[in-house]
Amino acid sequence: MWTVESECGRLRAVLIQESIRGFWEGKLPFTGIESSTHYLARCPHADIDGGKEQWGQLPQFLEEEGVKVFEVASILEKALEDATTGERRQIVERVWEGIPQAPPAEELTLGHLLSGYPERPYYDPRSDRVVLPDFQRVGWPYPRDTSFTTQVGTVICNMRRYSRRFEPRVVRLCYELDPTLRERTEVVYDASRLDLGSTEPPCVEGGDTQIVDEETIAIGVGQRSTHTGFMEATRRLFEADTDGKIRYICAVRLPDYPALDYMHLDVVINYPDRGRALVMPYFFESELVPDMPPRRLLLKTLEAVRAQAERDDRPMEPVVHPNDFAGAGSCAVYVRGGDAPRLLRRCPSLIDFLVEEGKLEKDGLIYVGGRPERENDVEHLMLALMEQARGASNIVTLRPGLVVAYERNHATNDELRENGVRVKEWEDSYLDMLGGPHCSTSPLWREPA
């Protein structure tokens, strides 16, 4: 069985998702922020041809390093070509479970799976109404979020974002229909099919989940993954771990809405090499790394932004409050218990936990935007915030000391190189500010660091 044993060991197999048309041109306006084209306004000049050309560099980078690449749409297209009517009927039942109308099995197409049923909106003159696709199931090129593989098997995620709620159903089909994935992977927990009847949804997402090493998993809890989702996933993973591989599973606190650029753990920390981490400065606190840029400067900057907004009589609702970052980066460490995971201890910082456990070197931190030149360097803070928003921290490691990173984050990429990390620069003028190389890859098989 394929497993993932680290974030920076040699990457052997990966799942990617080519959904460029759905990303930019398949979203309907007027249906709320999660489907509105206005949500993409931070990258207003995106065009499908340029974006597709740039996205195509990703599988090239992976294959150059010998990584076996599986792509969602290609898997589904091949499966439909070979499927009998009975097999198509099973697919329809799985994907459209609980949905009133579904395509006839004999008419099922790839477009139905990705874009919804019907495939395209149309005007029906008989009823004098516009008919819309029921749900766009694959509209984002970020398979990291919908499933993740651990030391003990694969988890299908439960998405908190409404626009992605049915995407895991389609992604799970890939694990079942591709012959290699069916043989080499094992789904040990499908969170998308879970209903605990609780007031908080049991959401857990792959962008929040990091396999730090052979015995440690970190899961961010905040805008996407919930505490309920974390606890249930932790329980299921310990249950699946019959050989006792997993020692620690850490819940890492993340800012809540409206701090949208901090929605997942993988936008504030990643691992380019053994004992090293690329981190967003001003986010984590540390008692063990005294020269870490302090969060206090970020909070003071947020205070200034809010004061300026109030002075100018601008709406305050979407402006991040300093309290949104209270406790950010702290972690609760869980170990195997009797009937449920047991809280071992709380740490003021994930960084300090990793240093204490020998999983991260004290001098192994590499900062987004490089190091500040002076104390309370607000210009450096602004640079780090801008590069982080463009996905600077969202690198994916192909093997120890070799990463794929977005090209436009010059300061961060230079800092990686100065610390001995080789960088494959991914052209990103059409791609960044919504997700990066880490989001765009879901490791299926990765060696220990």
What are these regions (language model features)?
Residues M1-A449:
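The feature marks the mature, well-folded catalytic cores of soluble enzymes
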